[in-house]
């Protein structure tokens, strides 16, 4: 048996390979990059937002924003733990060969909000679309639903399969209870 696979090999092995078009070399290749958003409570290589990722062109956006740290009272140690986990996960993605646009809380131009940071990322990367796994909080879900209108870029909100049931399935089960 060979050596055990590391995180990089597991992630890259799960990614589909994009075949070159028949005109490769004849035409300038148009890259249709996707901006893939990972939120602070979504630190998983199995996240639906990463399905179909093309490491040659897609960009993963991760943001430390003040609005997430202040909308309710959080213990300072919890905030430090979440930010440290986010930074570690971003580094793991980079080691897997992915392009990560990481907006740190201490960056002078950080606007402090998901929406404006996504608008800034769209201006930087000019993606063909935005993909995000459905946020776990209704407040952030409402924000995600507004991003397409605010950026002019199609937004795909994917189901979060880290839960036992989708929101739709749970709502059907809970109906009338």
Where are these regions (language model features)?
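Trp/Phe/Arg-rich N-terminal binding region typifying the photolyase-homology
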Residues: 31-177
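Extreme N-terminal basic, low-complexity initiation segments
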Residues: 2-10
């Amino acid at each position: 048996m060979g050596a055990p696979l590391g995180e990089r090999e597991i992630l890259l092995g799960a990614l589909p390979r994009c075949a070159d078009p028949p005109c490769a070399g004849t035409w300038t290749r148009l890259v249709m990059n996707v901006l893939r958003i990972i939120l602070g409570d979504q630190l998983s290589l199995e996240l639906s937002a990463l399905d179909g990722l093309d490491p040659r062109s897609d960009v993963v956006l991760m943001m430390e924003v003040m609005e997430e740290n202040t909308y309710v009272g959080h213990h300072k140690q919890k905030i430090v733990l979440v930010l440290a986990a986010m930074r570690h996960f971003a580094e793991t993605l980079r080691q897997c060969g992915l392009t990560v646009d990481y907006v740190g809380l201490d960056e002078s131009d950080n606007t402090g909000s998901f929406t404006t940071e996504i608008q800034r990322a769209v201006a930087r990367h000019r993606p063909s679309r935005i993909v995000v796994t459905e946020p776990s909080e209704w407040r952030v879900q409402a924000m995600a639903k507004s991003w397409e209108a605010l950026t002019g870029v199609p937004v795909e909100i994917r189901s979060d399969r880290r839960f036992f049931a989708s929101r739709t399935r749970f709502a059907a089960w809970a109906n009338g209870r």
